Amino acid sequence: MKQILDFIPLIVFFALYKMYDIYVATGALIVATAIQIVLTFALYKKVEKMQLITFAMVAIFGGMTIFLHDENFIKWKVTIVYAIFAIGLAVSHAMGKSAIKGMLGKEITLPDAIWTKINWAWVAFFSFCAGLNVYVAFELPLDVWVNFKVFGLLIATFAYMIATGFYIYKHMPKEQKEQKEKSSDVSLDD
């Protein structure tokens, strides 16, 4: 359910962009993201920092897009959000912590060196996406950027998550792998 809530603003943005224009879509994105935050809190009594950062950026850059009638602000939002995530992961590492380990370490046991590699891999991914967005947003037509934002980045993120999952599984202790496999077998039998 939580993952479905994450897609609603993107779907709303894409649909209204195709039906109207970037300004209507941006206004709807702001509203849909606010509703997503409220629903997430109502259902789970917690909102992740990444969601709050994303909402703040959507509200600020989306508001500027609408108020100044300049689509460049919403285009920059994507780059800035990815850059914030990359910087956040890098800073967490510099402070002796791994944000990725903080999110997943309660459920998965891995050596610190592996958590560090995963953390830096995500820093690289977010940095690459931030840079790629600048190119697509400002060198290609708006329609291409909207498709890239909605589909390209989404697919790339899913693919990277899956690759990270395989990497984690490869480095999990044998006992933990067996436990995960047993819990998967039980849920398949139900």
Swiss-Prot record:
UniProt family annotation: Belongs to the YciB family.
Compartments, as annotated in UniProt: Cell inner membrane
Name of this protein: Inner membrane-spanning protein YciB
Role description: Plays a role in cell envelope biogenesis, maintenance of cell envelope integrity and membrane homeostasis.
Encoding gene, per UniProt annotation: yciB
Protein species of origin: Vibrio campbellii (strain ATCC BAA-1116)
Keywords assigned by UniProt, alphabetized: Cell inner membrane, Cell membrane, Membrane, Transmembrane, Transmembrane helix
Coiled coil region boundaries: none
HAMAP family documented for this protein: YciB
Main location: membrane
Membrane topology listed for this record: Multi-pass membrane protein
Source lineage: Bacteria, Pseudomonadati, Pseudomonadota, Gammaproteobacteria, Vibrionales
